[in-house]
């Protein structure tokens, strides 16, 4: 009897242990399904605000728009979370394992992961060689008759020294105009607009200020549309736009000068196992056709 009782107790322990392992395994699988992006669960779509040049370029490059009554309509799914700057976008994606977003390639850091798009890695070199096709211009926008100091700053941006600043900060330079030979005029310059252009503009400001301490430069971060509007109205001397000018803006007297090319990186949380995505999949996610990570293969 004692031997039989011991055997029953032993079997009971084995059964309990087996159940425990099964329960823990189920819990682990459930946890993986709910906490790890790319292995189930809904996609959290994050976009930029209306007026953002990055959003405008993104929807155009990925075809997230339709022509209705002769006008382009943004077809971004209405359940998308909206962020108002590059930094907020990165913070939002880094804090949500199921999130997807997009940012200026020049602003990319290790807090998020950039996906390869159509098999090409998001790098400045791949933009130069044409394999990574998701790119757009960085423009500075002015109206007629800029001040002497504003004109001198623009000459610096376009110079060999200015374009070196662009390249050193992981953007793609445009053809430079040679060595900077400014006259170091004094005065204040107000620069306003795109949060994507702002980081490189801050670096250009620093480099120019070293050469011309007589200039005072104030940078106001907002979005591309605000930058263009402020340049046209005289609120700022230079507008920043991370997109091409609209015909309506040109008709009002806005003039754009390309100072760099930049890619748009499609980003996910670092815990997301996904590394590659196609342009069509990005479009389907942002139009709401695809809603789950299980649908991305």
Show which residues each predicted segment covers.
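Exported/periplasmic ABC-transporter solute-binding proteins
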Residues: 28, 33-297
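Sec-dependent N-terminal signal peptides of Gram-positive bacterial secreted proteins and lipoproteins
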Residues: 7-35
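Short, Lys/Arg-enriched N-terminal segments with co-localized hydrophobic residues
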Residues: 1-6
